[in-house]
């Protein structure tokens, strides 16, 4: 930046810039030195200089801007070749696909984990229900068996009671039959005795029923 400002200032004021001699220009050959002339007097020198100035005015100094400055241009560095847009786009697409695949992989893993948890939870609950069912069935069957045992015991007791009742009824019936038989025997014996008495006395007994 400082070199550019210096070049600009030198180009704006060419009168102050001296033209450098080319580096490769060969030096001129030395001219032959003439024999020294007699030294002029100071008055002659002053007069000659004044006349020379009048006859030959100093020419206007013309400067060639093209030769005034020698600008050394730095080689322009070529920019690195940019990657094609398609390659960058493909890279972005691949990165997006990888990110999406990774996200989907995490989602699938989470889904499988949640499904596994749900399956295990359901299986555990089903196992608990099965165990509860078996426990309740076992309790009911034990209660039923106990009731059956109680019923069997009561049935035996009732059967024994019934047998005892039947035996008592049979005994009472036998007693009643025996009493009837005894009464019948007494009545028959009494009738035979009364009939023998009537035969002996010749008395006719009164009819006791209306069948005669």
Curated annotation (Swiss-Prot):
Residues 1-88 are annotated as: Disordered. The modification Phosphoserine is found at residue 13. Its main location: membrane. The keyword Zinc-finger does not apply. Residues 23-41 have a biased composition (Pro residues). Transmembrane segments: none annotated. It comes from the Eukaryota. The keyword Cell membrane applies. Keywords: Cell membrane, Membrane, Phosphoprotein. It is found in: Cell membrane. One of its GO terms (biological process) is response to salicylic acid. Residues 45-54 have a biased composition (Basic and acidic residues). GO terms for cellular component: cytosol; plant-type vacuole; plasma membrane; plasmodesma. Belongs to the remorin family. This is Uncharacterized protein At3g61260. The lineage of its organism: Eukaryota, Viridiplantae, Streptophyta, Embryophyta, Tracheophyta.
């Amino acid at each position: 930046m400082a070199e550019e400002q210096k070049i600009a200032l030198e180009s704006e004021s060419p009168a102050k810039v001296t033209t450098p001699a080319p580096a490769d220009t060969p030096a001129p050959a030395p001219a032959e030195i003439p024999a020294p002339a007699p030294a002029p007097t100071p008055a002659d020198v002053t007069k000659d200089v004044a006349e020379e100035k009048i006859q030959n005015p100093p020419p206007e100094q013309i400067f060639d801007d093209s030769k005034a400055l020698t600008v050394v241009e730095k080689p322009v560095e070529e920019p690195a070749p940019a990657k094609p847009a398609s390659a960058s786009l493909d890279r972005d697409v691949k990165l997006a696909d990888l990110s999406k695949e990774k996200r989907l992989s995490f989602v699938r893993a989470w889904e499988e984990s949640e499904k596994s948890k749900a399956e295990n939870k359901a299986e555990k609950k089903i196992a608990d229900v099965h165990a509860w069912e078996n426990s309740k069935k076992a309790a009911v069957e034990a209660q039923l068996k106990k009731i059956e045992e109680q019923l069997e015991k009561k049935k035996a007791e009732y059967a024994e009671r019934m047998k005892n009742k039947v035996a008592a009824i049979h005994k009472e019936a036998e007693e009643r039959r025996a009493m009837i038989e005894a009464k019948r025997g007494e009545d028959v014996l009494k009738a035979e005795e009364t009939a023998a008495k009537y035969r002996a006395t010749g008395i006719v007994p009164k009819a006791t029923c209306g069948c005669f």
